[in-house]
Structures are given as C-alpha cells and as structure tokens.
Amino acid sequence: MQILVDHSQKLRRSVTMKIASHIIEETISKKLLELAKTVVIDGFRKGKAPIHIVAKRYHNYLCQDVLYQLMHQQFIAAMLKEKINVISTPNYTYSTYQKDKDLIYQVEFEISPQVELKGIDTITVEKPLVQIKETDIDAMLTQLIKQNGSWEKTNNAAKITDRVTIDLYGTIENKRLKGSQAKNLNFTIGINNKHIIPGLENGIIGHKAGDNFNINIYLPDEYFPLELRGKLAIFTVALKKVEQYRLPHLDESFIKLLGVVDGTVEGLRNKIRKDIEVLLKNAVRNYIKEQVINYLLSVNNIDVPDIMIEQEIQIIKQKNTKHIGRIRKSALEQSRELIEAQAKRRIQITLLLIEIIKQHDIKVNTARMRAIMEEMAYLSPQKQEIINSYNSQSSMRRQISNIVLEEQAIEALLMKANVIEKKIDFADFMSKLSHS
C-alpha cells in the first residue's frame, strides 16, 4: 500500500496511489481459477474448459473488476489507517494498465470537516424576563374569539371587512381586457388585497348581493402590459354574495368547544395562561439558542463539503414540497443562492452542536425527552397522535432525542456565558421575535 502524492485542498482531496503489478496478476489468476470451476463454454462440460480458453474469453472483464476492487480496498485501508472520514463516493481514475507494470491511479473524494470550537468562553446572551399579565390573557382571548368566528350571508350593503364573491370582466374602448375575466372571485374588502386592482374594492362598497354594476378604473402604474397603464377600464361586476364575519358568544358551549371541561370563563383564562407559559418557554429557549448559535457561527469558520450541501438542499426542497402542497413549480422554486445558504447554515449548526456534545460528553436525558414530547403534544391539536408516535415510532424518539441533546448542549455553554437578563412585556417580546 502506497500513497505517492496527496493533493489536499481543504475538504476536497485527491491522492495518487500505486498497486504492485504482482498483486494484480496474482488476484486475476485466482479469479480465473475460481471462474473456471463454474463457467460453461461451448464444447466443454461445466468447469472443464482449459484455463487458457477461460482466460482468453474473460481476462479483460476480470481485469477491470479486479482493478476496481484492489483500488477500493487499498484506498479504504489507507483512509482507516490515517483516520480520515470520507463522506463522498471515491472517484477512481487511471490512464491504462499494462501487465507486469505497477498501476498508478488517482482518487478524488471529499472528507468531513473538523471543527475546532472557538469562542465558547466569550459568549454573551440576552435572557428575556417576561411576566404574563392579565392584559396578555385578554388579548389572547380576543384573538381566540376572532379565530373561531364564521362567515354568514347578509342582505346588507357591502362594507369594509365584509367578504364578497363576484364575477367580473374588464373592457377598454369596448374591447375585452385580456386576463380581466374572473368567476366566483372572493376576497375580504380592505384586508391586504394586493391581487385586486386598486379602486375595485371601493366600487363594490355600498352594493348588495344580486347587484350588477360597472366600475370605472384608471389602470395603475404597475399594470401589465405597459401600454395599458393609465388607461380607463370599465369593469362589469356581478355581486353574487356578501358575507359578514360573526363572532361567537363567550358562553358555556363555546368555552367547552375550546376544551375547557367546566365551561367557565375562569377555566378558559387559566387554560390560556398555561398555553402562553408553554409557548413562552419554547420562545425564550429558542431566542437564547439563536443568539448562541449566531455568535459561534460568527467566530468559527466552518467549511462544508459540496456533497453535504447538495444532500441538505434536496431535504429542504422535499420539505418545502410537502409543506406547500400542489402549487405551480415557479412558486415553489427559490433561488439557488438562498437554498444553498440555508443548507450550508443548517449543516454548520449541526457540526457545531456535534462538537459541543462531544467536548462536554453529553448524554441524552430521557426524562427530558418525555417532557419535551408532552410539551409538543400539549401545543398540538393532534395530541394523542404525538403521544402514540412517541411510544411506537423510533424515528419520533430520535427526533426528540436530538432536540434534547441540542438543549443540553446550549445549557452547557450557558454555564460559562455572560447572561444579561432583561425585563420585557410579553406582547413586545413576541413582536420582536416576529420581526427578527
């Protein structure tokens, strides 16, 4: 076994290696003898053909097979000896092989990055101290009531916040406006309708279901095609339905529907408080973790192999497809740069956490695994499904095990970190998270 040249370039490696000719020829001869015992050749009984005839027919095929096996065996043995973690499929190349001459070949491969952890003694994080107030519960209760409202038809004239269903088409100088026709188009008036032409909503306000009318609109500067911008368009509208959003009454039946057994407002407020506490616990934990990770990424320059990035990109795309569902491909595709940056960051975080766990000899706390599962179940409408998955699926337990190990790794670093406590209102903290 011999490595002649090592062309090392960080994570992408290329080595030149040599196999002695006598090893190759001995291996080919051995393979030919084994093959001769089983091969069937016309004119001879099975396994009785002379070795020179077997060699003439199968030598080239066996030679290629033997060369690959010997190259692979030699390369793997060399990597194990040098304790190099190869993460890609090795690519073997050679110019030619001549009998009685040593084989010189090249191997290209990628290795796993080695993380030399820096900055663990200079971490500073802000820890939010959030006190849940009655006003926070009031706000959450109001939001809960709004979320459980329903749309009801009305014969009243349409107004802002009503939902309308319309048919329409547009014309310019008595000619149909291409792309302006719509059937059963529904939207809520005045609620962030970027896809609605400015002026259309105002023209609908005041009309009732069953009305047919025209709305004159000068096409906006953002309209396409360009030559139609600023021109007067007439939209013919059939208002088919007007709906108002009705809020539920805060009574016993509604409260029980929300999972509060006693049906009391006090019981509901207690449940909301617990919901906020669980939500807040996770939010604070993730907020601190994000600070730690961002700092470590800023002081640790971690190279990531191309093959790991490509694998992570495929995982991200698969998750995006499942999350978004069946939509146009153009809407699903993100720019290559964005996905690649996201994939690289995720791998770097994983490598950092692995190194932290290794350095601190962290073992997963099984009691915390159960606690995390119960938190996940509490916050999810599929509570029983999560519990059943945890009890029956090893993949679910592995997922939670990784979450717990991450938490323990961050906590180990926080033991030495400069933690600055800062009081902040619940609403302000959640708003800060949404804008970060």
From Swiss-Prot:
Reaction equation(s) it catalyzes: [protein]-peptidylproline (omega=180) = [protein]-peptidylproline (omega=0)
Single GO biological process annotation from the record: protein unfolding
Domain PPIase FKBP-type: 161-248
EC nos: 5.2.1.8
Gene Ontology CC: cytoplasm
Keywords of the record: Cell cycle, Cell division, Chaperone, Cytoplasm, Isomerase, Rotamase
Cited HAMAP family: Trigger_factor_Tig
PANTHER family tied to this protein: TRIGGER FACTOR CHAPERONE AND PEPTIDYL-PROLYL CIS/TRANS ISOMERASE (PTHR30560), TRIGGER FACTOR-LIKE PROTEIN TIG, CHLOROPLASTIC (PTHR30560:SF3)
Protein name as it appears in the record: Trigger factor
Source species of the chain: Baumannia cicadellinicola subsp. Homalodisca coagulata
Gene that this polypeptide is encoded by: tig
